[in-house]
Amino acid sequence: MKYFKQFITLLFLFTLIIAQSNRDGIAPGPDRAEGDGPYDRLVIRGATLIDGAGGPPRGPVDIVIEGNRISSVRSVGYPGVPIKKDRRPEAGDYEIDAQGSYVMPGFVDMHVHAGSVQKAPETEYVYKLWLAHGVTSVRGVGLGPLEFTLSEKERSAKNEITAPRIWAYQRAGQGKDWKGGPVRDPETARKWVKYAAKKGIDGLKLGAYEPSLMAALIDEATKQNLGTTAHLGQTGVARMNVIDAARLGLGTQTHFYGLFESMYENNDVQTWPMDMNYNNEQHRFGQVARQWKMVKPNGEKWEALKDELISLDFTLDPTMTIYSAGRDVMRARNADWHQIYTLPSQWD
């Protein structure tokens, strides 16, 4: 059993190395040579505001931004009625006429990668694609190698590149000057978390590690004030599903692996077909919805899991976009916007 656990751990680490190597060598964002600002005082005038707090749109409003922070949002009139100048904030260094436009907080994408050498070797394409869709903050899981990610995070914060704000979540064992070797035991896990925290990461991207290793990583991350998110892949979900990880203090589940397994009626792992191959993503994605036969909607286990995850303040980040595309491949493949926006290498 000891050697079997070591084999599974090595297999898991080898898979991560392959995935990471695909992101090694990607080009960082070019120095910013376009755009305006920042300004000491920016005023956006006459917009219809969606504030993100659950209320309906309202406007017209004038929004004042000072020192890169919103300092006031002022209602300046009513739809179809001329705006009185005495209701408006003082002039800014720069002003945007937003009449007829909507203003809302930027989206936060909780699961991103910066691309790969094979598919999107230049991060400029990825950054601008996110921004064009209104994504102004991203959590890289990981964005790329540790040093690359921290450099891009700092350059974005300094407005040196055209990119969203970046939060850096990294895999255990990363770091060019990390001398502790592979993270295979609790003691090494804690040492690496302390090392990575000093480097400046924001959190850990975890896998379905064996319980003692997972516990050490999460516990030390909490002590270092780091966040945690996990892809609980099926290669390890029998020993670490969502409720197991949540009880250890995990903050977020990314993807959907491990969630259904936490509320199976009569199984511990999914009943795979005889020709199942985990490395075939069509097999993996195609089997997801088949778990409905193993779960009882609104049943006792369903309700108990829901209540416990809520009590633990646990976050679910299911990343269903690619799965949804896989369920209707022809619609996704023939979308009108591919010709203009999709990088040709994405089709290779």
Where do the language-model regions lie?
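Active-site neighborhoods of metal-dependent hydrolases
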Residues: 195-202, 251, 259-348
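Bacterial N-terminal signal peptides
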Residues: 8-16
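Active-site gating/metal-coordination segments in enzymes
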Residues: 171-224, 251-252, 274-296
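Divalent metal-dependent hydrolysis catalytic cores, especially in the metallo-beta-lactamase
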Residues: 126-147, 163-173, 197-209, 218, ...
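Histidine-centered divalent metal-coordination motifs
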Residues: 46, 101, 108-115, 231, ...
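Histidine-rich, glycine-flanked metal-binding segment
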Residues: 25-40, 49, 53-104
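Metal-associated gating/positioning segment near the N- to mid-region
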Residues: 88-160, 179, 184, 240-245
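Active-site-adjacent beta->alpha loops and helix N-cap segments on the catalytic face
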Residues: 145-151, 208-220, 263-273
